[in-house]
Amino acid sequence: MRTIAIGVAGLGRAFSLMAPTLAADPRVRLLAAADPRAEARAQFERDFAGRAYATVDQLCADRSVEVVYVATPHEFHAEHAQCAFAAGKHALVEKPMALSMAECRAMIDAARAAGRHLIVGHSHSYDAPVRRTRELIASGKYGRLRMITALNFTDFLYRPRRPEELDTARGGGTLYNQAPHHVDIVRLLAGARAVRVRAHTGAWDAARPTEGAYSALLAFDGGTFATLTYSGYAHFDSDEFTGWIGESGQEKDPNAYGATRTALAGDEMTLKNVRNYGGSQQPKTPTRLLHQNFGVLIASCEHADLRPLADGVWIYGDREKRVDPLAAPAVQRAEVIDELYAAVVDGRPPLHDGPWAAATMEVCFAMLRSAREQREIEL
């Protein structure tokens, strides 16, 4: 089996969450990384016996690297992806793809000019339960898809943040960090082009001056519509509705209420650094693996409501309720590697390519504009 050599641009929190997948999947090898923090570079060298560079330019110049995983701060995604393409590498880019449609188009053009793949992820539209829901919709067994309801209440805004993560202009807040998940999911389920959006946003804490909440109504060609609601204000936790299974498929303690806000009483940058790769607070290995989720999701067809959960898809039909079970994942987020490997090794076009991700960002930008201008936006 051919192994893909991966170089990581940015050893922050995104890499901490993706590292277990990259380390466990035999189809990929973590060969090199770039990060300005010496302690993170040293940790990478110890953990993976790889090469570590201080700059992304140096990483892209490494001829052994085939794919650059761009996990740098959002404002640098376009620059670093284009650096990878200029060096003849493929790029796997964390969401959000970029901070403007002009940047998205530049990334797509650079990938095409280089003859390399641009894949954007992880997003929760990769999740096996979401994809299985799409298969059930596409089967036609339950009639046409009419409505999608997506809701998620978390502590997102009160997790430790760098200053730019609380600045919308630099890619901070829920519209750049969380809405791409929601929009990707409903676009995948709808299987049609989004045509209109009307949104409202909330920024209710002056100490964290970015959008912490949003609600949007999204219309698709063919008449399907979706409602998206998200709050990151660390009050209600919608994992209560998913059996206390968290976003990463981990079992959660319902008695740990308020822990995120309480932790912020300390030094925020110290807390941020210990959560980054090389810090003392790394994602815990779950005692049992379950599929990831992004809150409550219900796809309403003419003859059934379909609800993906951590272990399968519940089908609420005209006369019966049953579950379509899914086997537990062997490796979390393996679906990302499936798509990357199929593209790079087998030459199969990826679903989450540049145009797909740009269409998702077009909706996210329109949500911001709709809330600002207080009107519906045509896409």
Regions found by a protein language model. Give the residues of each.
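N-terminal Rossmann-like dinucleotide-binding module
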Residues: 1-47
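C-terminal helix-rich "cap/oligomerization" subdomain common to oxidoreductases
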Residues: 2-3, 67-69, 268, 274-275, ...
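Short, Asp-centered acidic motifs that coordinate Mg2+ and/or phosphate
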Residues: 32, 67, 147
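Conserved SAM-binding strand-loop segment of SAM-dependent methyltransferases
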Residues: 50-56
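Beta-strand-loop-alpha-helix segment that lines the small-molecule cofactor/substrate pocket
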Residues: 67, 73-74, 78-125, 140
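Glycine-rich, N-terminal phosphate-binding loop of Rossmann-like dinucleotide-binding domains
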Residues: 71-72, 152
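Predominantly a Rossmann-like dinucleotide-binding segment in NAD(P)-dependent oxidoreductases
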Residues: 117, 124-228, 232-249, 374
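Contiguous C-terminal substrate-recognition/catalytic subdomains in enzyme active sites
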Residues: 232-298
